[in-house]
Amino acid sequence: IALLDRPGMEVILINAMIQTILKEGLEDKTFIEERTEGITELKEEITALQPQISGMMESNKNEVEKAARIFTQAKRAMILIGSGLWSHLEPKDIAIASSNLALVTGHMGKESCGVLILLEKCNSQGAVDMGFFSEREGNGRKYLLQKASEEKLMALYLIGENPLVSSPVLGRQALEKVSLLIVQDLFMTETAKMAHVVLPACSFVEKEGTYTNLERRVQKLIPFRPPLHQSKSDFDIFLSLLRLLEYPIQGETPEAVFEEIGRDLSHYRGIQDGEQWPKGSPYLYAEGFPNGKAKLIPVNGGLTHQKPEGYPFHLIQRPSLFQSGLLSSKSDTLKRVSEKLYLEMNPEDGKRLKVEDEEVVKVSTQDGRFLRMKVKYSSRPVSGVITAPYPCSLIEERDIETVKVEKLKII
């Protein structure tokens, strides 16, 4: 059942499903009483949101209620959160709202149940486990690039990142301001060409380590061959830098580092190749939650990107199999089958603007940035929404931009 009407309505949609479940008494009362806390506060918030939910969900009220009943009555149900067609305005709120939905229906701590956040890379879960996505101030690519562009950060050490492509506007502003740019990468990327120092890294077939996938399965990576030419594994590059800095090193092999991880992260302790963390746990929370009971946290996110006068479209990025092309563009075969650059536009909007399918248009932001791209009619975006493949130069960090679309004048 397709429910999402437009970007920014994810949390409202989930709250609408919870509202139906509570109103019709479909919640798992035993599970809520024994394994959660905060149900009273959640009910109060959902009741207070009634006008907002009704206004936003009026067009597909029946479908939302149907989906809520199906989800509740399912023996096993899982929520998958991906980048999808719509960009996430508040990813944390979406995750919390999804957890609320899973908890009130008892779809947590059981086989084939729960909430899974689908991340981009094969080892993204491993990066999360190591604390790479901390919420502390000073973390995050956009934050660091912003500080560098303001000349509040004078040195950048980039590993496997190419902000000139993934964040072209902010990336160039930042890289032109730093006094020292170090790039560690497999390729001589656009960003690497601007670097003061380039550290050549080898590929995954030449290094040892582990991958942790979404099901928390830790898999060992065995090198197929030695690093080519003067390249080194990321681990060996870090070791070389630590030695130059005369920093005390506790472990000089991947095995020693993995043992250290196990000492600091108890759920990694004793894990062998192919096992899931924590050891002996095919799914999480079967025996209970870390703090005893799971907390239901009310969230009330909504459409925060209003369309200013004269800019009637929401421009969002749609996921692309080839992403920025950092790896895929190195293959002639992949380049032949790669996605062509075009804007997806609802046919109703195209006809209103008198823009033909396959016609090139100009897309502009309020601050004067623009691009020209061919239009492709599609029923996927609703009227008022257009999509461009990731990465789009008008959008930074997978957000949403308000834009206007104009026919090109023929002189």
Task: List the model feature ranges, each with a label.
Residues 31, 211-232:
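P-loop/Walker A phosphate-binding loop and immediately adjacent motor/lid segment at beta-alpha junctions
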Residues 308-337:
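C-terminal accessory/binding modules appended to enzymatic or scaffolding proteins
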Residues 283-307:
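Interdomain regulatory linker/hinge segments that flank or connect interaction modules
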Residues 63-67, 141-143, 297-303, 329-330:
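Glycine-rich, charged/polar anion/phosphate-binding loops
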Residues 1-207, 223, 241-249, 315, ...:
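Catalytic alpha/large subunits of respiratory electron-transfer oxidoreductases
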Residues 82, 288, 299, 316-319, ...:
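Structured loops at beta-to-helix junctions and adjacent beta-edge loops in soluble globular domains
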Residues 222-281, 328-344, 348-411:
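Long, contiguous, secondary-structure-rich segments that constitute the structural scaffold
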Residues 31, 42, 115, 211, ...:
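Short clusters of hydrophobic/aromatic residues that line enzyme substrate/ligand-binding pockets
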